Amino acid sequence: MSKRFKFDSSEMIYLTDKLMNAASNRYSIVVQVARRAKRVRYDTVENIDDPMIKPVQRALMEMTDELTEPELLRD
């Protein structure tokens, strides 16, 4: 059984809050995170680059890193 990389829950809450505050529509950002997580999950099955991070956590990290480009948060 593989161990998952442990994230600090306060860090994940901070990233989520940061992403929600930057979005104009909460529903659309939740859908975008879900789609990104699904894509990340399928990419990790093929590439197996870092199976220790859950797909939703990786999606949140990637999307908060992309906050400097606001056009990525729109549909």
From Swiss-Prot:
It catalyses: RNA(n) + a ribonucleoside 5'-triphosphate = RNA(n+1) + diphosphate. Keywords: DNA-directed RNA polymerase, Nucleotidyltransferase, Transcription, Transferase. Its EC number is 2.7.7.6. It is an enzyme of class 2 (transferase). InterPro entries: DNA-dir_RNA_pol_omega, Pol_omega/Rpo6/RPB6, RPB6/omega-like_sf. In cyanobacteria the RNAP catalytic core is composed of 2 alpha, 1 beta, 1 beta', 1 gamma and 1 omega subunit. When a sigma factor is associated with the core the holoenzyme is formed, which can initiate transcription. Belongs to the RNA polymerase subunit omega family. This is DNA-directed RNA polymerase subunit omega. It comes from Microcystis aeruginosa (strain NIES-843 / IAM M-2473). The lineage of its organism: Bacteria, Bacillati, Cyanobacteriota, Cyanophyceae, Oscillatoriophycideae. The gene is rpoZ.
